[in-house]
């Protein structure tokens, strides 16, 4: 296996991880909106077509009815959360690696990298859950014709007033179920591909931008291949009226399989996979570029 990344300062981690996260959200949010609307659309009545027939139909209708701003609905919530979330994400991955090293020069196996990635998923849940909750509510209200919330802060304020802190953190368990294994797959795949793509005699840190894009994009696809079923459950649970699912994700899972079959757990699959490659390619390239710039501009930071 090729060389491990060198330790970086928390401030550099914050700045580079935040920049990578902003790149991810900006590139991927339109298809994330499509994904959430597909996952949360109500079952069609007998003899009537569904609200959206698929990814491209949802994209087309959203663009036609709401314009380009409709595709970026609810983006403020993930943008606000990405800087600390991605800083914590990369910090958690680095900490997970360090905890498994007996000596600083030890090279970790791929199962160890997977475990380190899982730790990053635990770290990010506290930031991710409220952002996802608000984002999903804002994304579906436009398609449903309701306008309960005027924006991100208004949504957070009303959730807290109505349900307290638990209302904002609704879906925490499902976020953990999604992000812990998916983050393990995410980082392990990225490190594996970086090692594969590194030419003979070169270091991983010298990998070209196109190869970073490909490694990051494929890592995103592997991440979402693991994350889609719990993500469907999370989206449905977080946007449901209070009290609809008293037993949590078990009730959501039971209802989905009963009413729509096992394939309902992969609602929005096309939108997710179309989004996964460019969004995560942008994330990792943004992170790597920011880190190189910071190491050049402020080597002692």
From Swiss-Prot:
It is a multi-pass membrane protein. GO terms for cellular component: cytosol; mitochondrial envelope; mitochondrial inner membrane; mitochondrion. The modification N6-succinyllysine is found at residue 170. GO terms for molecular function: carnitine:O-acyl-L-carnitine antiporter activity; O-acyl-L-carnitine transmembrane transporter activity. Residues 32-73, 132-170, 231-267 are mitochondrial matrix. It is found in: Mitochondrion inner membrane. Keywords: Acetylation, Disease variant, Lipid transport, Membrane, Mitochondrion, Mitochondrion inner membrane, Repeat, Transmembrane, Transmembrane helix, Transport. SUPFAM superfamilies: Mitochondrial carrier. It comes from the Eukaryota. Coiled coil: none annotated. Its main location: mitochondrion. The keyword Acyltransferase does not apply. PROSITE patterns: SOLCAR. Solcar repeats lie at residues 8-99, 108-196, 207-293. One of its GO terms (biological process) is in utero embryonic development. The modification N6-acetyllysine is found at residues 148, 157, 170. The chain crosses the membrane at residues 13-31, 74-93, 113-131, 171-190, 212-230, 268-287. It catalyses: O-acetyl-(R)-carnitine(in) + (R)-carnitine(out) = O-acetyl-(R)-carnitine(out) + (R)-carnitine(in); an O-acyl-(R)-carnitine(in) + (R)-carnitine(out) = an O-acyl-(R)-carnitine(out) + (R)-carnitine(in); O-propanoyl-(R)-carnitine(in) + (R)-carnitine(out) = O-propanoyl-(R)-carnitine(out) + (R)-carnitine(in); O-hexadecanoyl-(R)-carnitine(in) + (R)-carnitine(out) = O-hexadecanoyl-(R)-carnitine(out) + (R)-carnitine(in). Belongs to the mitochondrial carrier (TC 2.A.29) family. Mediates the electroneutral exchange of acylcarnitines (O-acyl-(R)-carnitine or L-acylcarnitine) of different acyl chain lengths (ranging from O-acetyl-(R)-carnitine to long-chain O-acyl-(R)-carnitines) with free carnitine ((R)-carnitine or L-carnitine) across the mitochondrial inner membrane, via a ping-pong mechanism. Key player in the mitochondrial oxidation pathway, it translocates the fatty acids in the form of acylcarnitines into the mitochondrial matrix, where the carnitine palmitoyltransferase 2 (CPT-2) activates them to undergo fatty acid beta-oxidation. It is linked to Carnitine-acylcarnitine translocase deficiency: A rare long-chain fatty acid oxidation disorder. Metabolic consequences include hypoketotic hypoglycemia under fasting conditions, hyperammonemia, elevated creatine kinase and transaminases, dicarboxylic aciduria, very low free carnitine and abnormal acylcarnitine profile with marked elevation of the long-chain acylcarnitines. Clinical features include neurologic abnormalities, cardiomyopathy, arrhythmias, skeletal muscle damage, liver dysfunction and episodes of life-threatening coma, which eventually lead to death. This is Mitochondrial carnitine/acylcarnitine carrier protein. The lineage of its organism: Eukaryota, Metazoa, Chordata, Craniata, Vertebrata.
């Amino acid at each position: 296996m090729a060389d491990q990344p060198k330790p970086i300062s928390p401030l550099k981690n914050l700045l580079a991880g935040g920049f990578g996260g902003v790149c991810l959200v900006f590139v991927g949010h339109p298809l994330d909106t499509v994904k959430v609307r597909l996952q949360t659309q109500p079952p069609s009545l007998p003899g009537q077509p569904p609200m959206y027939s698929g990814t491209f139909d949802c994209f087309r209708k959203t663009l036609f009815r709401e314009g380009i701003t409709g595709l970026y609905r609810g983006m403020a919530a993930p943008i606000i959360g990405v800087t600390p979330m991605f800083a914590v994400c990369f910090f958690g991955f680095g900490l997970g690696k360090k905890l498994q090293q007996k000596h600083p020069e030890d090279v970790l196996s791929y199962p160890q990298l997977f475990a380190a990635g899982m730790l990053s998923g635990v770290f990010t849940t506290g930031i991710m859950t409220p952002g996802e909750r608000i984002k999903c509510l804002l994304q579906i209200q436009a398609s449903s014709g309701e306008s309960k919330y005027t924006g991100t802060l208004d949504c957070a304020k009303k959730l807290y007033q109505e349900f307290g802190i638990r209302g904002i953190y609704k879906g925490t368990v499902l976020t953990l179920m999604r992000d812990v294994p998916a983050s393990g797959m995410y980082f392990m795949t990225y490190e594996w591909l970086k090692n594969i793509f590194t030419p003979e005699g070169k270091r991983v840190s010298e990998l070209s931008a196109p190869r970073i894009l490909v490694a990051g994009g494929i890592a995103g696809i592997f991440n979402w291949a693991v994350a889609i079923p719990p993500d469907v459950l999370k989206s449905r649970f977080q946007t449901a009226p209070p009290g609809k699912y008293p037993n949590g994700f078990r009730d959501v899972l039971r209802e989905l399989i009963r009413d729509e079959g096992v394939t309902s757990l992969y609602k929005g699959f096309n939108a997710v996979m179309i989004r996964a490659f460019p969004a995560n390619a942008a994330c990792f390239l943004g992170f790597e570029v920011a880190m190189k710039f910071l190491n050049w501009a402020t080597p002692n930071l």
